[in-house]
């Protein structure tokens, strides 16, 4: 990024006066008489020519990415008016992860002297204020406000006041944990509030701040002498809080279940919820954890949470509205404690109905061990559903299977994927596309079975008619058996895990997506994703299960030879491919949009 450095020199007596001899390109604003911190900032800010102005104290040391992370954040959301850094002492302890102003006017540097790497200090959040040692806002907003209010001259509380002014102007004040600044607090103005130095103004100006913003202070969280900062630390008073629990932080580019969780997390944020996320492995996994934290989601990770979660739930039981528990093997670990110790509403999302999927696999294979596994999961899943306020699955097929066993269970079908952005530039010239594509993670057994079946029973028929055709296989955790399918000259190309960008390119360049699933349950995320990407698709009845108005977007066939023939026919019919592609975005808007999904579940989220 381009930037200018303005030195606000308030009649310094050290080597600052000679800095232009050693550093080129500086804008130096040197006062003739000492103005004090506040007026010095106001005066020097007049020289700023850029879009943003960053106030950085002289008693600081910056770290890698400190500035770009602030700029990226403020430019990501036009409701944000001011952003600020995580401040850390030279000894590595935390000085502040945003500031709290209580209703009585008292203030906290949230997290002071704690470990700055703890989860609660590392997500983007609204805050009451950010210490002025490192804050950034637009020059236009700075001018609109009029700079620091000079009633707080020479120093102290001007940063808190500025934050309230930013909110008065209709914008948010937001903390950016990726911007880490080491602050040698007290070097500039000392630490004695009772002495004759500048620090004494801290007490006087606190009273002025309280008087100026008396009406606003009434809306602040209450300090009862031992306050719980759960809401005050992120200005979440009046907002609903949802705790989402899954097996781990969603690896949204690796598997369909993670993508579902990730998209619903985004939807909850969009609908105004404060979102807390708990991965059952308590790990901080990159780049996925930082992605969620930069969205504003607090992730409960680390040994502190592994041992302290139950106490945290008890302490904050009245602050959390909904516990959204994913997958039966995870949800069962938490549901009993939540129901026995809190009034938090439990909503359960099973992802797929395990006993139905395994029952179908047993019917296909006759393996008695799979039948035993299906029976085991049937007991687990039904027990979990009976404990939840309501349970979700991706298709009515699963809901009907549940109600065939127990009509009293409250359950409904919800969209497997939910989108808030729709594609507008899909390549519809199918004469320029080539190859078949399969996408699916191989930790999920139905996907491995599908590729093996296609490669052995279907693809040879296709190659007889289209000898040069390629079959691209994409997915994480590729097994050795899948890798062995790729042989010289056989047209099978095992891509394995690819980035989101490369996957988008494959969707745009491959002609037909095949989803040859022989067993499974519910709506398949890979099918919805392929529709979203405008792909002509051929699948089985299992792959098409739960897809509404399936004839609009899919070709369906279960017989291997006929599947091959239909694939060849579709591959050679560019007009049919284009017709299937043209309707995909309208279809996704109707059936798999965030707003549409919220209409289905909104009534379930009342406390």
Please annotate each region the language model reported:
Residues 60-102:
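Conserved donor NDP-sugar-binding/catalytic core segment of glycosyltransferases
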